Amino acid sequence: MMEQKRLGDIATYINGYAFKPEDRGTEGLPIIRIQDLTGNSYDVGFYNGEYPKKVEINNGDVLISWSASLGVYIWNRGKALLNQHIFKVAFDKIEVNEQYFVFAVEYNLKEMEAKMHGATMKHIIKRDFDNIKIPFPSAEKQKEIADILLKVVNIIENRKQELKKFDTLVKARFVELFGNPVYNTNDLPIRSLNELGNWASGGTPSRTVPEYFEGNIDWYSAGELNTLFLEGSVEKITEEAIEKSATKLFKAGSLLIGMYDTAALKMGILKEDSASNQACACITPNDEVNIIWLYYELQMMKEYFLSQRRGVRQKNLNLGMIKAFKIPIAKRDQQDEFSDFVKQVDKSKVKVQKALDETQKLFDSLMQQYFG
């Protein structure tokens, strides 16, 4: 049987410094918090003063967030300072392949999550963290495993970059044909969204009748509006659920638009007749607009429209606000030309996405094989 070692016997884990809000300024070294690692921060603070040398991080340092959001990262953004709730890993106890260690910890994040404590700020206590065990083969085997997994990760990243290039290509084509819609650089006629089709919002069937959620009709939440075409919802409902609630059946080819909080102006086009909850608005377009063109028109104007949201804690839109939004309208034949271009690009994207999904399955299988 493969030898196992405790994380606490492999390395020393140095917690970051508890910087105070008043320590954060605009000059000096960046203060790295958990949200700066996860990509959810748009507000990097800086510290220009003396600090414990142990909380300094540099390229190549391995970091582990252990509170609120668990994760393992290899730092690559230059000299910085580590905030509390993140460990810097010092490999000072035994010889270990650092990349192998990162993959092993990544695999064990779910086990760590199960050991988290706390009502508000969930965290894993140091004792539980130290006691987590990982397989510990020879140095040669560690390197072999790390190299194999890195190759698969690189393929995954390359596939993701391919998908991003397709998105960039579509946006470039849009601007080439229609200009910048926020500034209406092509001087197109302006129309309100209310004039471009029939509008409605969704609803939620009663949860006290579980049978309502045992049907085969897609019922979307705003959080599921992540792709151009919607392929299927997490929850399904029955025809009776639609008849006895505020939800409605929207036609295939309609566009769902999220209205609330972080899902505001997330969008997706229905491939099948479907329903949604009350957090979604829906437009069934008239003959003046091609729905694929409208999707991209709204994507291009998304940030402009989001700036008009209401609410202090939750920045929300509502159906009336969305219907009142005004957009430049291109000629229908140009819309159709753009839509045909998108469909061709989408065929290529589907192939790359399939390859990405298969590579991700391979990675997950290898992780299970090596660390499960």
Task: Report the location of each language-model feature.
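Non-catalytic DNA-recognition/assembly elements of restriction-modification systems
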Residues: 1-17, 131-147, 158-203, 324, ...
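Sequence-specific dsDNA recognition surfaces
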Residues: 5-20, 30-59, 191-209, 223-252, ...
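Short coil/turn segments at secondary-structure boundaries
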Residues: 20-27, 118, 186-189, 206-214
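A short beta-sheet element
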Residues: 33, 52-106, 221, 238-299, ...
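Active-site/binding-pocket entry motifs
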Residues: 37-40, 69, 88, 111, ...
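Short, solvent-exposed loop/turn positions at domain surfaces
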Residues: 50-51, 157, 244, 311, ...
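A short glycine-rich beta-alpha junction/loop motif
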Residues: 66, 80-87, 118-140, 259-260, ...
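Short amphipathic alpha-helical signal-transduction/dimerization elements
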Residues: 105-109, 113, 153, 299-302, ...
